[in-house]
């Protein structure tokens, strides 16, 4: 009887402790992996002139698909359509690449002019309400989430640097972060509620942009959405490590499996440092996918058997396409062969992941 009484007393106490721990976890500020706290480099010389800000894109996000006219596999580029597409999105991609480059320059050089220039670029677009149009198609909403991931990922290095470079720029920081929050909320609307047959690498990249925005703006709701999208993705990975919706890309199936990995590895790495371990989701789906891709890079025969097509290896010859190896090997004890593949291709720099991926995932905290 005494034991039973003690159990009745202990259980509510344990439950209360668990609830309190949960509340503390929920209240904790969101953080990036340790490398994002790296100090700004020692000042080297004077900054050059600040390039002109690309005109803020405030128009309709209805763009031509570079696969226009292709069959359901969406694997054959339409050269004429691609040229039109590149012309339509030039200001957006100039912004992504240019702002990321300016942040990288500042983190390396410590020149105040580079910081002022980067913040001017971003705050100009923020004040204009760029990329917020409600008039969009699939290609347009894809550009919105890619740009958000690029810009918020680069800005994150400024936000969390131990040098506190944003301390003297509170107003611009607020404008930029409010803009990111608006875009993040829109990206969630854009990519929520899709049927499983429509959820592919685009949704994964949307989830990465929302995860990056969540950490920059300390928005737990955005963080939770990104984690939930990761879980959907993980449960699309089959027992052999294939993504059925990417196998539909036929001759580009292997390339698209590889393209799915950067956002998923980044989300998992960011979730991990915020107390959410996604490595075992669907019995280690991320690891199965990564290993399947690297085996395919060595020998594409399995992908050829699955798709009935010779694989287009063009993208897979570009080192930066493997930038996912940095967050991935921060999560897992990578086998020697994978570590060698990573080392051979480093340093990784991907503007869609915010710039210097190798630097922010280095053991030395970015040095």
From Swiss-Prot:
Residues binding substrate are 65-66, 138-139, 256
Any one GO CC term of this protein is:
periplasmic space
Q: What class of enzyme is it?
A: lyase
Location in the cell reads: Periplasm
Catalytic reactions on record: Eliminative cleavage of alginate to give oligosaccharides with 4-deoxy-alpha-L-erythro-hex-4-enuronosyl groups at their non-reducing ends and beta-D-mannuronate at their reducing end
InterPro entries in alphabetical order? Alginate_lyase, Alginate_lyase_dom, Chondroitin_lyas
Q: Which CDD domains match?
A: AlgLyase
Under Enzyme Commission nomenclature, its number is: 4.2.2.3
Indicate whether Signal appears among the record's keywords.
yes
The alphabetized UniProt keywords are:
Lyase, Periplasm, Signal
**What GO molecular function annotation could you give as one example from this UniProt entry?**
poly(beta-D-mannuronate) lyase activity
List the signal peptide residues. Answer: 1-27
Keyword match Signal: yes
Source domain of life: Bacteria
Which GO terms are recorded in the biological process aspect for this UniProt protein? alginic acid catabolic process
Function text: Catalyzes the depolymerization of alginate by cleaving the beta-1,4 glycosidic bond between two adjacent sugar residues via a beta-elimination mechanism. May serve to degrade mislocalized alginate that is trapped in the periplasmic space.
Family per similarity comment: Belongs to the polysaccharide lyase 5 family.
Q: Write the protein's name.
A: Alginate lyase
Upper lineage is: Bacteria, Pseudomonadati, Pseudomonadota, Gammaproteobacteria, Pseudomonadales
